[in-house]
Amino acid sequence: MPVSPLLLKFAALLSLGALTACGPQGLESPINSPYVSGAESQNVLYTAFTQRSPKFLDPAKSYSTDETPYTYNIYEPLYGYHYLKRPYVLTPRTAVAVSEPSFVDQAGNALPADALAKDIAESIYDIKLRPGILYQPHPVFARQADGRFSYWPLEDQALKDKFVIGDFKQTGTRELTAFDYVYALRRLASPRVASPIFSTLADHIVGMQAYGKRLREIDTALRKDLPPGSRDLPWLDLREAGFSGVEALDEHTLRIRVKGLYPQFKYWLAMTFVAPIPWEADRFYSQPGMAQRNLSLNYWPVGTGPYMLAESLQNRRHVLVRNPNFRGEPYPCEGEPQDRAAGLLADCGKRTPFIDKIVFNIEKESIPLQGKFMQGYYDIPQVDRGDAGVAMLVAAGDSAAKATLYAKHGIQLPTTVEAQMQYFGFNWKDPVVGMGDTPERQVRNRKLRQALSIAFNWEEYVAI
């Protein structure tokens, strides 16, 4: 099922009544409610964030857990993960299917699917997109009756009263195409973006490294006569020059060429780094004056996902609302053996999303957050962190009174498996375990590092 796990988490919580935050419909709001009268009867999920607002909502830059409730519900990568199946299973989102690569040798000759890694020069991914997927209503697509864009080009005076994306009253949409993914992958190489994964993907995608170098040269030329630190930069149009490793074969077919055999590559395609970017959005936000007003993909994303950002008050409040152009995806009908008994398949086949609006309010202190959650002002303390749930599980285990209180409030504390990776590094400049300044020391130090790695008891470390 091409459904966002986080979206389905919201859906499951709401449909199961896992956390009862709102009072029965028809009752008046309590006098100390932080919400407007009648809000408790609306189809809204209330939650909180405890640190700053998300720093990056641009999918090429976003690499932090606290940004994922926004990015994975606004943008759509090619793939996602099945909400209920464990171990995790890739599923298509905007793609028709999870595509298997074809292989060629150095001469470009086709190889069988079971070819040896040493014989494979390239892995070629041809990915078909689902037709008819539309972007959210957004000013970047707005056009006048004669077909000209409503908000490009804009004169300086046109921005004097524009501070949030809602100040642009006209909106439009268009269909998602394979070129939007091509544009997104090209942006990863742009020096204007400084994506944290460019160097990693450039090692694997054919031609990406050289393309990044060429973009740096073009960007340097565009900045030549500008003062240092200028925020208003000429648009770096990525439609004009590309690289052979990524191309659109037609409107709905994307081809990616990967060096050698790299079976893990498909998992990158489930991350928002490869979420589509319409060139219209890149051009719209590059106009003079936009950066000074924080009008950019970092603050106002443009996507095809189930939700869109309707309100954004930095370090105060963010609101996601249902994307009216979202096609709707069926809730899964299969999962783990215990899921049916737990009621997690009760909504089988129903169209998602189930929730009309998601409201994030800042709560800097944990005790007030916990208190408001227990009073019903929040459905979930934090959607991106499980700390509160872990603390409540411990409290319920230690105190029968707490367990009774949670049961009285109808609070459920389901657990799931989360994949994590931890590692320890060696100081490369250390004379004993580092690189070593002679060939002999390099060999000795490497063997010592390997011995330490073998001797380290990971099982005991995890248990502690």
Report residues per predicted region.
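Surface-exposed patches in mature extracellular/periplasmic domains of secreted proteins
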Residues: 90, 193-201, 463-464
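C-terminal motif of bacterial Sec signal peptides marking the signal peptidase cleavage site
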Residues: 18-21
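Intrinsic-disorder/low-complexity, polar/charged segments enriched in Ser/Thr/Lys/Arg/Asp/Glu/Gln
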Residues: 44, 122-126, 251-255, 357
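A structural "hinge/loop" feature
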Residues: 51-71, 82-83, 91, 139-142, ...
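Bacterial N-terminal signal peptides that target proteins for export
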Residues: 1-11
